[in-house]
């Protein structure tokens, strides 16, 4: 989750809004991470499944709202999600995608035109980029942003509530903070329940099954300085991990760090 120096492609195409990023992805002008682009706009994780599994997955998300906050669901076979974006096409409007067959990653295409099916249902799931913007606006430093690396993520011993074939441990992201900033972060992120909300754990990583903070399961390791404590949030990698573990016959998702940029504003997600 790196912050980009400018909100434009090398070719000068603006990436200031969610629609700008979608159109740049559609044209092939944007092929990498969306972090730092479309500031102020909500970015979403994608989980795309056959309709026969959609109800079970929706129940899984409803039972596990911290790691799986749903912000949009499509009709079967419909690649649009007008509730979160004008002229949005799920098949083309993300810089890169993942294709899973029987739980195994088999391709990482630039678009889903060759992989789209009429029985597919898209779930857009809230992303921590939204609350990170609020933390940075409050002058709370984020080490992974400062270092230009991906946030470290870990599988825990916290079991998600199962639904149908979907079950498994919660994945969390970790951000080191001073105790004072951790308290402020709880206050700030509590106002964003649709993008993971408040931390689920602070300190003592071993209490949630994490043995070594220098060896994340996903993302990149970051240093924890003297006087800092690890702060853990439920993470949107959880649904992808659970889908893969379920070994369902066919599923699609966004590529790592390549989110769906919506027309929703981060400020509109805040409560209270």
Swiss-Prot record:
Keywords: Lyase. InterPro entries: D-Glu_cyclase, Putative_hydro-lyase, UPF0317. Its EC number is 4.2.1.-. Gene3D superfamilies: PSTPO5379-like, PSTPO5379-like domain. Disulfide bonds: none annotated. The keyword Metal-binding does not apply. One of its GO terms (molecular function) is lyase activity. HAMAP family: Hydro_lyase. Belongs to the D-glutamate cyclase family. This is Putative hydro-lyase AZC_4080. It comes from Azorhizobium caulinodans (strain ATCC 43989 / DSM 5975 / JCM 20966 / LMG 6465 / NBRC 14845 / NCIMB 13405 / ORS 571).
């Amino acid at each position: 989750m790196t912050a980009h120096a400018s909100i434009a492609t090398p070719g000068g195409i603006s990436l200031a809004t969610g629609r700008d990023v979608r159109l740049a992805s559609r044209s092939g002008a944007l092929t990498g991470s969306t972090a730092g682009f479309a500031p102020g706009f909500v970015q979403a994780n994608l989980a795309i499944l056959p309709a026969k599994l959609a109800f079970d997955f929706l129940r899984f998300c409803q039972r596990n709202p911290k790691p799986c906050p749903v912000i949009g669901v499509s009709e079967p076979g419909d690649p649009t999600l007008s509730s979160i974006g004008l002229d949005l096409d799920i098949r083309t409007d993300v810089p890169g995608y993942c294709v899973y067959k029987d739980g195994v990653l088999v391709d990482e295409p630039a678009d889903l035109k060759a992989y789209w099916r009429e029985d597919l249902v898209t779930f857009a799931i809230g992303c921590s980029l939204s609350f990170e913007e609020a933390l940075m606006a409050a002058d709370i430093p984020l080490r992974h942003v400062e270092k230009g690396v991906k946030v470290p993520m870990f599988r825990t011993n916290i079991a998600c509530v199962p639904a149908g074939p979907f079950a498994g441990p919660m994945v969390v992201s970790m951000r080191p903070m001073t105790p004072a900033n951790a308290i402020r972060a709880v206050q700030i992120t509590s106002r964003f329940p649709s993008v993971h909300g408040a931390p689920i754990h602070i300190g003592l990583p071993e209490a949630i099954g994490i043995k070594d903070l220098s060896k994340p399961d996903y993302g990149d390791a970051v240093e924890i300085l003297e006087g800092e404590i690890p702060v853990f949030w439920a993470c949107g990698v959880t649904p992808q991990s659970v889908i893969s573990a379920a070994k369902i016959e066919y599923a699609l998702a966004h590529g790592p760090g390549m989110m769906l940029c919506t027309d929703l504003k981060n400020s509109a997600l805040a409560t209270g």
